Amino acid sequence: MALNVVILAAGKGTRMRSDLPKVLHPIAHKSMVQHVIDTAYQVGSDAIQLVYGYGADKLQARLGEQQLNWVLQAEQLGTGHAVAQASANIADDDTVLILYGDVPLIQASTLEALLAAREENGLAILTVNLPNPTGYGRIVREGGSVVGIIEQKDANTEQLAINEINTGIMAAPGKQLKAWLGQLSSDNAQGEYYLTDIVAMAHRDGVAITTAQPESAVEVEGANNRVQLAQLERAYQARAAEKLMLEGANLRDPARIDIRGDVTVGMDVMIDVNVVIEGKVTIGNNVTIGAGVILIDCDISDNAVIKPYSIIESAKVGVDASAGPFARLRPGAELKEDAHIGNFVEMKKAVLGKGSKAGHLAYIGDATIGSGVNIGAGTITCNYDGANKFQTIIEDNVFVGSDTQLVAPVTIGKGATLGAGSTITKDVAENELVITRVKQRHLTGWPRPVKLKK
């Protein structure tokens, strides 16, 4: 018996006021429908049917590389009609799990509970109790057993008082589901084919109907406009922040962190306010992350300190190393153990060796720097000639004076000293002192320029 997941993603989302299909609007830098697809994989789906309509080209451009069966719903005639478009891809012995591309916060654990609640060849529906159920289909029970779902527009006064609502998420047996879909009618207040009508059919046919509920109602909330999208974003971030704290991170203010990827943290991590984490980020033990830091696809080792307003992207920070404030590590940069870069230092495709430091105002690109090196303020590795990039190699224990330019390709030998203001165009041997600045001149009685009269 296979688990066949059907994801409904055909709507335009008019209230979003956007050319982008509704399900492609992002939560934490990932489209809503991608969140749902990822969750479907987590519960062990054997196949995923993506029912699409509006914006097919944009959907396929974003999702096309994944293992999905694309099912076109040319006309949006209701949820029942949408699922029916996937019937040809459903085997009789499949368990069919129906999800929604604009309900991104549904948890795998909730879906697992729903599947576990389903009896053999039975129908399981995910419900939730709301203090204000206005707008939702109500769960109709008789003697405690579910007998049907009535939509808001079709409900009578007594049914409108029910606060258990249908989330739309359900698990059904493939053979019966296909039969029920063929019996749907659009004879209702909205003139649509309601998927919810299959619940009454299941009751009629004597099929066992069971229910499950999510841990939190926010799991089943959708986004029809940008206000609701922002609310889901905040709910996602609150959940992500809670997870970090349970794993060992101290968040200065859990409401002021944005997590837009997969982050792993060690013990006793301190994260200040307004930090943004994107992509795959690993943070070791006893790490301190300052306010306003942006971490993207990077590894931060034990005891490292990232001072405020630094950006670390596709880079590595070693044990006891530090960066910032206002430092930038671009892709391919690495700080080795106990290395340090300070304010307004930028590194790209470069390694700063153990115990080496660049305190301020430097650009280090396409360079390999050994241990115990001092990079003075204003130092620049001139790595680009307008067509190609070249390497700078600085060996151990080199002292680079302030305002030095190293014109690559160039190698500086161990223990060398480069005088401040030098432009280095040739290799420097070990323990040499090199000074290339112009000889200082003294002109006595020099008349300073004065402003011309207008």
UniProtKB/Swiss-Prot annotation:
Instruction: Give me the residues that bind Mg(2+), please.
Output: 102, 224
Listed GO CC annotations? cytoplasm; membrane
What is the protein's major site of localization? cytoplasm
Q: What is its EC number?
A: 2.7.7.23, 2.3.1.157
Instruction: Please write the reaction equations for the catalytic activity of this protein.
Output: alpha-D-glucosamine 1-phosphate + acetyl-CoA = N-acetyl-alpha-D-glucosamine 1-phosphate + CoA + H(+); N-acetyl-alpha-D-glucosamine 1-phosphate + UTP + H(+) = UDP-N-acetyl-alpha-D-glucosamine + diphosphate
Q: Where is this region: Linker?
A: 227-247
Free-text remark on how the cofactor is bound: Binds 1 Mg(2+) ion per subunit.
Q: Where does UDP-N-acetyl-alpha-D-glucosamine bind?
A: 8-11, 22, 73, 78-79, 100-102, 137, 151, 166, 224, 330, 348, 363, 374
**Pathway(s) it belongs to:** Nucleotide-sugar biosynthesis; UDP-N-acetyl-alpha-D-glucosamine biosynthesis; N-acetyl-alpha-D-glucosamine 1-phosphate from alpha-D-glucosamine 6-phosphate (route II): step 2/2; Nucleotide-sugar biosynthesis; UDP-N-acetyl-alpha-D-glucosamine biosynthesis; UDP-N-acetyl-alpha-D-glucosamine from N-acetyl-alpha-D-glucosamine 1-phosphate: step 1/1; Bacterial outer membrane biogenesis; LPS lipid A biosynthesis
Superkingdom in the source lineage? Bacteria
Q: Where is this region: Pyrophosphorylase?
A: 1-226
Q: Does the keyword Zinc-finger apply?
A: no
Cofactors needed by this protein, per the record, are: Mg(2+)
Output one GO BP term: peptidoglycan biosynthetic process
Please list where the region (N-acetyltransferase) is annotated.
248-454
Q: Which UniProt keywords apply?
A: Acyltransferase, Cell shape, Cell wall biogenesis/degradation, Cytoplasm, Magnesium, Metal-binding, Multifunctional enzyme, Nucleotidyltransferase, Peptidoglycan synthesis, Repeat, Transferase
The active-site annotation reads 360 (proton acceptor)
Answer whether the UniProt record assigns the keyword Nucleotidyltransferase to this protein: yes
Q: Which family does it belong to?
A: In the N-terminal section; belongs to the N-acetylglucosamine-1-phosphate uridyltransferase family.
Q: How does it assemble?
A: Homotrimer.
The name on file for this protein is: Bifunctional protein GlmU
Q: Which organism is it from?
A: Shewanella pealeana (strain ATCC 700345 / ANG-SQ1)
Question: What's the gene?
Answer: glmU
